Amino acid sequence: MAKPTRKRRVKKNIESGVAHIHATFNNTIVMITDVHGNALAWSSAGALGFKGSRKSTPFAAQMAAEAAAKSAQEHGLKTVEVTVKGPGSGRESAIRALAAAGLEVTAIRDVTPVPHNGARPPKRRRV
């Protein structure tokens, strides 16, 4: 039987994009898109091998942002606008890691959804 032809990853040439950082209490997901929202690269703390409570650390968020930035720079990305969503601990370190990886951060926008008193929040933890 003939070998299935592998689809080559097309190298897009995009100068500027948007870095979406989704920081939850359990994980941090960094997705880099073009200005229209088409994904160029993504990474998360869990995808890098962090498990359990280590996923929610600022260091894990930093590593996820670096990995996403590296693979986005292969497509020619140079500048990003950053949108941050969620209350997680990896918000600041992910933004710093994007800048340290060589991407120029032009704007930082907080798009955390705030309920107008919607669903009941989880009960308080008693440790």
Curated annotation (Swiss-Prot):
GO CC terms of this entry: ribonucleoprotein complex; ribosome
The UniProt record lists the keyword RNA-binding: yes
InterPro entries reported for this sequence: Ribosomal_uS11, Ribosomal_uS11_bac-type, Ribosomal_uS11_CS, Ribosomal_uS11_sf
Pfam families: Ribosomal_S11
Purpose: Located on the platform of the 30S subunit, it bridges several disparate RNA helices of the 16S rRNA. Forms part of the Shine-Dalgarno cleft in the 70S ribosome.
Homology family: Belongs to the universal ribosomal protein uS11 family.
Quaternary data: Part of the 30S ribosomal subunit. Interacts with proteins S7 and S18. Binds to IF-3.
Name of the protein: Small ribosomal subunit protein uS11
Native species: Streptococcus uberis (strain ATCC BAA-854 / 0140J)
